[in-house]
From Swiss-Prot:
Residues 194-196 are annotated as: G5. Residues 153-156 are annotated as: G4. It is found in: Cytoplasm. This is Elongation factor 1-alpha. One of its GO terms (molecular function) is translation elongation factor activity. GTP binds at residues 14-21, 91-95, 153-156. The keyword Cell inner membrane does not apply. Pfam families: GTP-eEF1A_C (PF22594), GTP_EFTU (PF00009), GTP_EFTU_D2 (PF03144).
Amino acid sequence: MGKEKTHINIVVIGHVDSGKSTTTGHLIYKCGGIDKRTIEKFEKEAQEMGKGSFKYAWVLDKLKAERERGITIDIALWKFETSKYYVTIIDAPGHRDFIKNMITGTSQADCAVLIVAAGTGEFEAGISKNGQTREHALLAFTLGVKQLIVGVNKMDSTEPPYSEPRFEEIKKEVSSYIKKIGYNPAAVAFVPISGWHGDNMLEPSTKMPWFKGWQVERKEGKADGKSLIEALDAILPPARPTDKPLRLPLQDVYKIGGIGTVPVGRVETGVLKPGTIVVFAPANITTEVKSVEMHHEALQEAVPGDNVGFNVKNVSVKELRRGYVAGDSKNNPPKGAADFTAQVIVLNHPGQISNGYTPVLDCHTAHIACKFAEIKEKVDRRTGKSTEVNPKSIKSGDAAIVNLVPSKPLCVESFQEFPPLGRFAVRDMRQTVAVGVIKAVNFKEAGGGKVTKAAEKATKGKK
């Protein structure tokens, strides 16, 4: 057995009718975790419903419906393999909570795949001022997804079909607007594809002999290829932050008979081992980790990306809750935030936002009301340069530096140091009205929290 392939996460973005589902469905279908039986079942159903022409997207719709009904479907279905990577699609838009998921998402995307439709009029609709394409690309960039691939889809429906001038026109247009957002077009692969017919998806298409391939240039070196799957192979692998201090936001806390209290969550940075003396912020409870397990197997060490349960001594289920963050008491432990400063981008708020506005913030697994105490300045979204100091209010489309005060204890970090704990969604009226990236945190001084006997004992024993 060779070494296991590296895992990477991608997010697929683009306008509603760009063919994201068909393209994604095609990759999952051809290279993915869906077994033949399931595919045949889906095909038969699609045929019976007269949706034969829709099979790839249909596969995805079936998966989406199950995902939305909260059925924990076999996540393997959202995975596919390239020659180099195991790729997981962490979310595809169209899902109601896409924006929120992308921010609080259980994982950071390593790369965004932007699908644009090449059909006459379709591309223009997706990219128009109110099209979703811009918003998704802006979000991806703001949230730290620095790699981008562009699939120019539906090449079979250009005038004439598979038109080179149309591809070049779209490439030029998209390059100019992703550049405005902050991406470097020279580092972006542009691939003309048909997600439906499969052109340039896995191998070079005979229908576009004019396409000599895509090239990218970046400081890590050059890459080139012909197909979309090769572009995915050229993604730079992420550095998983094992060397940083431990941060593990809790998703749930269970009481398990005969074992005790078991918090569950995903290691975002650092490592967690049995014997670690952890502190839970913002409650400031310190205790010893007895054991760590993943998928019912004991682990000697959990690393970033691992979803684990760990057993803690002398702490009751009532003392811990979702949204708390575990860290190592001896290595830059997490603390509660008194207040914090963030760059906020307003996406869709019907009115004006001014000082005193108190929506709910979703940051990692925490869900807490925070007050916009002071809108310090309006800034240019791309450069971050100040355009107005102490504005009266901000509205949709604006970016601003804001000071926020949580209404209850909350543990957050700067995006610079701990990205997953430094980005948030602002929720109001059942939608995401803004997104933010935390610049600086004013921590509360940790005062007299609970230190369990287990922690004291373990600490004494180690002296």
